[in-house]
């Protein structure tokens, strides 16, 4: 197995572990030279292939190169690249059966561009975009069967816009809205069969106005008015045929 360590976003050292022995390449030492090596499994299949080129610069973590790992069955496991000691370019990971697991891009040590994950079956699991190390735009997650599980929206890594959750049968589960990282706007939840469960409004992260909740059979369970806090609430409970007022300090 090959392990790497980072310090301040830069490649610091490599550790290759083979059975009970460990070989440690400390790049923080000032005797860095170009290195290339390959390891094999006992069955003859390639296990690790690493290139490291210092480019004549002996400063900490300034080298460039690639890491490539394989499973014992010969299928690729991991492919990574570095420029000046920082993650750079397209990185890829695979399942042992040969199906791609992840693919994402780096630019000068920061995630940048498209990010995708798959299930072992090959079905897409997650897709989204990074910009300068932060999530940007729409991010979508899928169930193993292919139906959407969630949709999220970001601006500069901060939740923004509409977020939605779905049941495996494709029916909506929850919808909410974000404004620069703060919940604001309508909030709605549904049962798996499509029956509405909860509905209300949020402003600056606080529930306001009329909130209504229903039982699974569609019968209204209660309704209440909120004024940005829990100090004053007035609830009407239909199922129990009781009306009550709640005032808390």
Residue ranges, per PLM feature:
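Glycine/tyrosine- and acidic-biased, solvent-exposed loop/turn segments at the edges of beta-strands
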Residues: 1-249
């Amino acid at each position: 197995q090959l392990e790497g360590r980072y310090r301040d976003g830069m490649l610091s050292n490599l550790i290759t572990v083979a059975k009970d022995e460990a070989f440690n390449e400390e790049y923080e030492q000032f005797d860095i030279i170009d290195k290339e090596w390959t390891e094999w499994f006992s069955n003859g299949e390639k296990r690790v292939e690493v290139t490291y080129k210092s480019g004549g610069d002996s400063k900490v973590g300034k080298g460039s190169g690639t890491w490539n790992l394989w499973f014992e069955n010969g299928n690729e496991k991991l492919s990574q690249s570095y420029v000046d000691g920082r993650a750079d370019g397209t990185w890829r990971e695979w399942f042992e059966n040969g199906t791609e697991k992840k693919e994402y891009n780096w630019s000068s040590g920061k995630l940048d561009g498209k990010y995708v994950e798959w299930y072992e079956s090959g079905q897409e699991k997650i897709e989204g975009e990074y910009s300068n190390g932060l999530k940007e735009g729409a991010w979508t997650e899928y169930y193993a069967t292919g139906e959407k599980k969630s949709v999220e929206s970001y601006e500069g890594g901060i939740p923004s816009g509409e977020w939605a959750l779905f049941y495996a049968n494709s029916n909506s589960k929850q919808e909410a809205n974000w404004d620069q990282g703060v919940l604001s706007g309508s909030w709605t939840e549904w049962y798996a069969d499509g029956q509405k469960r909860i509905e209300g409004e949020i402003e600056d992260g606080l529930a306001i106005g009329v909130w209504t909740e229903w039982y699974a059979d569609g019968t209204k369970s209660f309704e209440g008015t909120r004024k940005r806090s829990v100090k004053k609430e007035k609830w009407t409970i239909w199922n129990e045929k009781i009306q009550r007022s709640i005032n808390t300090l």
